[in-house]
Structures are given as C-alpha cells and as structure tokens.
C-alpha cells in the first residue's frame, strides 16, 4: 500500500486527519481516503493572476488576495476584504492552476482576524 491521506470530510472542504484514532462525530460528513497522486499536493508556483479562484468563489471574494494578505500577516487589510465571509468550500483552491494552498491561508487568516475582532471587542467592553 502506498501513501494515503485521510480527510475528515470531502476532498475539497475536508481537513487532513493526523491521528486516525480521532473519533467520528455527528458533524462529520464522511471520511475520505485519498491514494496515489490524489494524496499529494501539487508543487506550488507563483500566482499567475488568472482569477479562476475569483470566478469559482460562490461568495464573490478574492481568494488570491486574501491568501496574499494572510501570508504577509496583514490582518486589518484581510478583515477589510471580508475574509470572515468565506465559507471554506475549497472551490478556489480546487481551480487554482498554480496549486496555491489558498484555503490553508484563508483559514489561518480567518482565525487571526477572529482573534483581532475578539480583542477589539474585549478592549471596548473594558472601556465601559
């Protein structure tokens, strides 16, 4: 048996499972096992500004820009680009000819922007 990748969820929105002893919980849509070439990520190359990710985004967002801002840790700019509206469907990453892990960067950015929003709310609450 070759290398396989096990996902909690489907091939586009699923998250890789590092521990196969993890329980399957109610919110899990399924377990996906990828083998062969499907288990490997393509080699990332530079964005060619083709905008396929933009066309594929059901929320009308600009995934290439959000990934770029996330890489550069520009959280305020990322918040202004409505990163929290991303539904993490994976369509952008699936269509990217440059094999950029857009969804990984967007998820990281959403976490950081969420922390920024919570910190801002906490600071505002302490002022009252």
Question: What is each PLM-predicted segment?
Answer:
Residues 1-98, 103-113, 118-128:
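Redox cofactor-anchoring modules in respiratory/redox and cofactor-processing assemblies
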């Amino acid at each position: 048996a070759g290398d396989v990748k096990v996902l909690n969820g489907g091939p586009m929105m699923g998250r890789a499972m590092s521990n196969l002893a993890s329980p399957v919980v109610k919110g899990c849509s399924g377990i996906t096992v990828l083998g062969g070439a499907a288990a490997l990520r393509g080699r990332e190359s530079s964005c060619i500004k083709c905008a396929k990710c933009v066309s594929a985004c059901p929320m009308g967002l600009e995934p290439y820009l959000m990934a770029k801002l996330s890489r550069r840790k520009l959280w305020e700019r990322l918040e202004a680009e409505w990163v929290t509206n991303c539904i993490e469907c994976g369509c952008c990453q699936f269509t990217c000819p440059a094999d950029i892990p857009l969804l990984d960067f967007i998820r990281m950015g959403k976490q950081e922007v969420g922390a920024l929003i919570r910190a801002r709310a906490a600071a505002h609450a302490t002022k009252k």
